[in-house]
Amino acid sequence: MAVINNQYLEPLRISIYGRSKVGKTTLAAGIPGCHVLNFANVEVEDLQKVTIKAHGGDSFVACEKLADAGKFDMNNYHYIVGWSDYKATVGKIVKSLPKRESSDPRPWIIYDDTTNFRMMARVQYEDEKNKVPGKMQWG
């Protein structure tokens, strides 16, 4: 089980909307209470679900694509940026994420760099005590 910033990343599921394909990809996940992005390997099981399978790699701050995410309310959301080839984005350091409490249950936003499509997601833990609200709304 992967642990980042004192948080267990498995088991959890991320419900996403608007993703166009099924398969494996790489997401950079902004971990609550942390100013960096951590890479995690994920597998899209169907068009609505994606599961974090494992965590690997070093921590990087957001790439250039995250800069325009400011149009969303940064007080209400975390950010996740999806890349098909993260090597092409490493070094494009722009800014860090806002600091968040590790217990903060609010939703995440996914930015799919391959389609330039922004998606909001909620992280739903299978552990009931970590279950987060299911309400989804755009920032």
Regions found by a protein language model. Give the residues of each.
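P-loop NTPase motor core
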Residues: 108-139
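Conserved P-loop
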Residues: 2-108, 116, 120
